[in-house]
Amino acid sequence: MSIRDHSYYMTKAYQEALKAKKIGEIPVGAVIVNKDGDIVATGYNQTISSNDSSAHAEIVALRALGQRVSNYRFPDYSIYVTLEPCCMCAMALIHARLKNLYFGAYDLKTGACGSAFNLISDPKHNHKIIVEGGILKKECSALLSDFFKERRQSKKELKKIIQDFKSKLGSYKHFFSISF
């Protein structure tokens, strides 16, 4: 596949990530592509909305593909994900026997494909996935950075509202005092 092809599929994964952001989830998206270049499964983070800590974009996409093809191994498929997979997702990709992994942003804290760990390329595994990172890196990184910046700002604003409310409530304390 050419870089142009990679950009196309990563853009589709990015669009999935926007779905996660829209529902308040960490914006990570994934698409799985067959050997003919068709997108056959998609996923985005749904851990909060589904009350499922394993509902990362990659896992959601793998589950969708498994249901579609009635199998759990996908040796002729490639996955595009906007963020470097964590340990859980990296192992799921290995067990699924995917051929290629392409990701956007590097995850220096929990990335298991070379950034924080290199679990995916551990020589003990009997299946090797071809890995390429940094596809649409700026866009994918910015989506995550902006999300967390907005989240911090919202928390700050909420904290101020609560402090203001407590302050105002304190000045009316005598109205709420009940003596027995």
Give the positions of each predicted feature.
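Short beta-strand scaffold segments in enzyme catalytic cores
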Residues: V28-G37
